[in-house]
Amino acid sequence: MNATEQAANGDRGTTRSAGGRLRYLLHAPGACQLMGVHDGLSARIAVAEGFEALWASGLCMSTARGVRDSDEASWTELLTLVGTMTDAVPGVPVLVDGDTGYGNFNTARRFAGRAERVGAAGVCFEDKVFPKMNSFFGDGHQLAPVAEFCGKIRACKDAQRDPDFVVVARTEALISKLPMEEALDRAAAYAEAGADALFIHSRMNTPQQIATFMERWEGSTPVLIAPTTYHTPSVDDFAALGIAGCIWANHSMRAAFAAMRDVCQRIRTDRGIYGIEDQVAPLKEIFGLFDYEGLEKDENCYTQAPDLAAVQG
């Protein structure tokens, strides 16, 4: 029984791979939640707080690398960060933001293959041309031809090793201010090309575009959203529309950004740290999250001096 069949039968049993677990969540009743992360620390925190799946955000990883979200970081740099996430939270599904696939079908399938090898559950590619710009900045978002993008999807599906590895197709038609019909047509074409899920993106300040899309969508392929700008509804509200998953794409990084800026300002202004200790995480919380006590126990176990008398008989 594959992960899709497990979800249909209400079976929450473990699956063979991270891809299988993500596939299960996308087909289970309701809308799953994927927390945006950018490194091993943010992944550990998200899982410790109960998230079952993660989104390796291109914006957040690029920002963590100190560059813009416009394909300035190489895909090998980003997948190195993804590896820190899968190492930090083994078995937890990580869906990787693969931007446009960094070129043609060949670079897209190479990206997907490398993501699979570092333990990711799946990849998401968007239908903009390379190089891209972040969807929330500016208006010059040119889309790739439908046939070209479908070729990327097919190439990735043909090359994957794990049958449960998830390939998500993201359309930027609404971001590019194209008609709803264009978004629906592209979604249908991408599903036909083999996409395991669709990501419908909007930057309106209400969910109306998403609601309209779901009312008119006749396919069975799961639909994901990232409600970054239309943030009033809850995950349950989106589930009622038929959404399969909500990606909280960049909130962890933005929270860290604000906290780091504020503490830097405070220390510089106060010329000391006497006023901030109650505003930062205690070191014991960090030691606890990373199981320092476990390492100490292992040291006692594995570095004890041998009993020479016993060894010599």
UniProtKB/Swiss-Prot annotation:
The protein's Enzyme Commission number: 5.4.2.9
Coiled-coil ranges from the UniProt annotation: none
Reaction equation(s) it catalyzes: phosphoenolpyruvate + H(+) = 3-phosphonopyruvate
Source superkingdom: Bacteria
A molecular-function term among this protein's GO annotations: phosphoenolpyruvate mutase activity
UniProt cross-references to Pfam families, sorted A to Z: PEP_mutase
Cited InterPro entries: ICL/PEPM, PEnolPyrv_PMutase_core, Pyrv/PenolPyrv_kinase-like_dom, Pyrv_kinase-like_dom_sf
Function, as annotated: Formation of a carbon-phosphorus bond by converting phosphoenolpyruvate (PEP) to phosphonopyruvate (P-Pyr).
GO biological process: antibiotic biosynthetic process
Pathway(s) where this gene product acts: Secondary metabolite biosynthesis; bialaphos biosynthesis
Protein name (database record): Phosphoenolpyruvate phosphomutase
Record keywords, A-Z: Antibiotic biosynthesis, Isomerase
Spans traversing the lipid bilayer: none
Family: Belongs to the isocitrate lyase/PEP mutase superfamily. PEP mutase family.
Active site: 69
